[in-house]
Amino acid sequence: MSAVEAKLAELGLTLPEVVPPLAAYQPAVQSGPYVYTSGQLPMVDGTLPVTGKVGAEVTAEEAKELARTCALNALAAVKSVAGDLDRIARVVKVVGFVASASDFTGQPGVINGASELLGAALGDKGVHARSAVGVAVLPLDAPVEVEIQVELTQP
């Protein structure tokens, strides 16, 4: 077990299996020392636990927890390419999309769920640049989607 996975276990979390792609793409790809994940939905055991727009059917607090799940799924995608999460030199960037009701403006707080998980699991290596974007709708009516870019150390 990697140190990152041990830290996740301390947080009461287990790295899930990689979420299978919903269309014609890979969950993650490596280019040089970087791994780019596809957008990760908050899938748990193959299903979305909640659907709808944040600020309407989904509360900001629920969405923040879903963003945390997205980040956990993104780490699983990184591991599928890197082989070991301890190879992460740093998280470079996080991009979060929030399916938002027309008057919802709390996207940064929602995506904090992903950012806080990465910081808790990776320490200083988890500090990153970030975008949090409100959108009208996401695939499968998911409330949140998160993608990450990480830099790896040499094996």
Model-found features: residue ranges?
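Short, polar/acidic, helix-capping and beta-turn segments at strand->helix junctions
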Residues: 1-155
